[in-house]
A protein has these predicted regions:
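Short, charge-patterned binding micro-sites
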Residues: 59-65
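A charged helix-plus-loop insertion that forms the helical arch/lid used to bind
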Residues: 69-82
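A glycine-rich helix N-cap at a beta->alpha junction
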Residues: 84-100
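Short secondary-structure capping/junction motifs at helix and strand boundaries
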Residues: 95-104, 122-135, 147-149, 163-165, ...
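Conserved short loop/turn motifs at secondary-structure junctions
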Residues: 102-110, 140-141
Length: 236
């Protein structure tokens, strides 16, 4: 008998679930466990139902906010990330959360995958350079438009003043995929669940997709821009 036919996992339905990659700017708290508890419960059910399950969780360790926090503490960003990441791992152990893969954005594997992906997408013509001007909230690590802001140019989330930002970055050409996405969702109406989330995405596309920056020259703590481009900065 063929050995492959004796492999029970070959005939099991596959189920993959990923949690957010948790930001390690500060220590985790009880709220940090909410999503992983729900994810763990779903995966346990799927295993009982006979599925071959893979649950991924992990941490997002890059960005200007983490770099600043580490500097304020007088340690390196990597040392800060190592310390806080360990606390997340300890939290999952305390709640008996079982996961299959743990991803760290500071790992060598992650860096290589991102660089490879960047090079492939750029080779297809979907990445280009342009100047970006905008209003940036360091706490959110995100750009804001003026209609989002509170009086005095304050971030609506953190109530801190946003910074004017201008630099030449790499952009992903998201706008060129509008028609393909519209057609994809027509052909696969059940791809996004629940339905109201699909309607949100469709409205977002109908309003016009915009290309967005994927690099920051002013940030050093992140996946470096590929050396072949002979530039400094980090990918977002």
């Amino acid at each position: 008998m063929n050995s492959q036919s004796n492999n029970p996992s070959k005939h099991k339905p596959k189920f993959f679930l990923t949690t957010p990659l948790y930001y390690v700017n500060a220590e985790p708290h009880i709220g940090s466990a909410y999503t992983n508890i729900a994810a763990d419960a779903i995966c346990r059910f799927q295993r009982l139902a006979g599925s071959e399950v893979c649950m991924l969780t992990g941490v997002d360790e890059h960005g200007g906010k983490i770099e600043k926090t580490a500097t304020d503490r007088g340690i390196t960003p990597q040392a800060h990330c190592d310390e806080i990441t360990e606390k997340f791992v300890e939290l999952w152990e305390k709640f008996n959360i079982k996961y299959d893969k743990f991803s760290r954005t500071s790992s060598e594997k992650h860096n290589k995958v991102v660089e490879h992906f960047f090079e492939r997408v750029k080779a297809k013509g979907d990445i280009y350079q342009a100047e970006y001007k905008g209003l940036y909230c360091l706490a959110c690590e995100d750009f804001k438009n003026e209609r989002e802001l509170l009086g005095g140019g304050l971030c609506p989330v953190h109530h801190t003043k946003v910074q004017e930002y201008s630099e030449t970055n790499y952009f992903f050409a998201l706008s060129k995929y509008s028609d393909k996405l519209i057609q994809f969702f027509k052909d696969h109406p059940d791809f996004i669940q629940p339905k109201y989330r699909l309607h949100e995405i469709q409205t977002w596309i109908d309003e016009g997709l915009k290309d967005f920056p994927i690099s920051r020259r002013s940030v050093n703590w992140g996946v470096g821009i590929p050396k072949s481009l002979e530039e400094t900065g980090a990918l977002q």
